[in-house]
From Swiss-Prot:
It comes from Streptococcus gordonii (strain Challis / ATCC 35105 / BCRC 15272 / CH1 / DL1 / V288). Keywords: Isomerase, Pyridoxal phosphate. CDD domains: PLPDE_III_AR (cd00430). This is Alanine racemase. The keyword Isomerase applies.
Length: 368
């Protein structure tokens, strides 16, 4: 999707806030624990290369979802370790070796395909994934995991790490988390030997279960100033949101009582009023279920009226504002604020889905 640089709709990214958040986390984690920044999905919509470049000197490595995201970082000049968290196609192994990118091994079936490929494995570095209860990818028992380690080592592959992922570390009820932790520790205890890097802590674990941190952590949503639990658990220390979503009024009109607004005529003015139009819609990530939510204009909350269109939304204004008046979708205006968590609660989802859904059509503008 082409970035629309000539519209007033922009995602403003405060890189210094991300830097601050990482330093806050580091201050509350053991000094000898490696800190890996999770920058998958374009750094949760914040811009992978820009974010990674800015924080490169305060993290030990980066985590991404796939080979293309990893190559984007390499092409952007990042040379620290990169771990692909997902399962990669066998065909990308040469690319991973060539670009010093670490792959995840999650099953013996994948390893069978790797061995059958007859590819050169010299220089390949891997981490093994344990499914301790998340239910997506990974080894579920000690025996196949140990077999994978043995076969990889015989093939000359460097087994650098082993990891798992917690499903409920961001919830008030820690029972499922404790089950997963016990499962992971039990499997580790049965292995013949452990690789150098053991990691299980995501953002939520790093915040609320610091006593379970091993020797590396994967820091994702929290570095962008997003509470992993939404509003369920209180953050133990100050974190700054890094992204604001803004635009401007491009059209203002006065309508009479009984006038309809938008597709389906779902909004009818109950009295004479001012309606403002803003060039941002569901193609930009502001989904149709946001009808009835507010935007901020001149420090006031203005409701979205009528259906959200692909490229535009309409809002009810308290007075007639001039064209070019700033509009805030996520961020602050005067004493009012709207957070990604507020948006998520309206949608019935999570705050990091909100920022990930801001499409490439919206330019990212960087501060600091």
């Amino acid at each position: 999707m082409k970035t629309s640089i000539h519209r007033p709709s922009q995602a403003l990214v405060d890189l210094s806030a991300i830097h601050f958040n990482i330093e806050q986390l580091k201050a509350h984690l053991p000094q000898d624990v490696e800190k890996w920044a999770v920058v998958k999905a374009n750094a949760y919509g914040h811009g992978a290369v820009a974010v990674s470049s800015y924080i490169d000197d305060i993290v030990d490595g980066f985590c991404v979802s796939n080979i293309d995201e990893a190559l984007e970082l390499r092409e952007g000049g990042l040379d620290k370790k990169i771990l692909i968290l997902g399962v990669s196609a066998i065909e990308v192994v040469p690319l991973a070796i060539q670009n010093k990118i670490t792959l995840t091994v999650a099953s013996l079936e994948w390893l069978d395909l790797l061995e059958a490929s007859s590819l050169s494995l010299q220089g390949l570095v891997v981490h093994l994934k344990v499914d301790s209860g998340m239910g997506r990818i990974g080894f579920r028992d000690r025996q196949p995991l140990q077999e994978a380690i043995n076969r990889l080592q015989v093939a000359g592959v460097q087994v650098e790490g082993i990891f798992t992922h917690f499903a409920t570390a961001d919830e008030a009820d820690a029972s499922k988390f404790e089950e997963q932790l016990a499962c992971f520790k039990g499997i580790l205890a049965e292995l013949d030997a452990l690789p150098p890097i053991i990691h299980a802590s995501n953002s939520a674990t790093s915040l609320w279960h610091t006593d379970t941190v091993m020797n590396a952590v994967r820091l994702g949503d929290i570095i962008y100033g997003l509470n992993p639990s939404g509003s369920v658990l209180e953050l133990p220390y100050d974190i700054k949101p890094a992204l604001s979503l803004v635009s401007e009024l491009v059209h203002v009109k006065e309508v009479e009582a009984g006038a309809d607004v938008g597709y389906g005529a779902t909004y009818t003015a109950d009295e004479g009023q001012f309606i403002g139009t803003i060039p941002l819609g569901y193609a930009d990530g502001w989904t149709r279920d946001m009808q009835g939510f507010d935007v901020l204009i001149d420090g006031q909350r203005c409701p979205i009226v009528g259906r959200i269109s692909m490229d535009q939304i309409t809002v009810r204004l308290p007075e007639k504002y001039p064209l070019g008046t700033p509009v805030v979708f996520i961020g602050k205006s005067g004493t009012e604020s709207i957070s990604a968590t507020d948006v998520a609660e309206k949608r019935g989802t999570i705050n990091y889905e909100v920022v990930c859904l801001i499409s490439d059509r919206v330019p990212r503008i960087y501060k600091n």
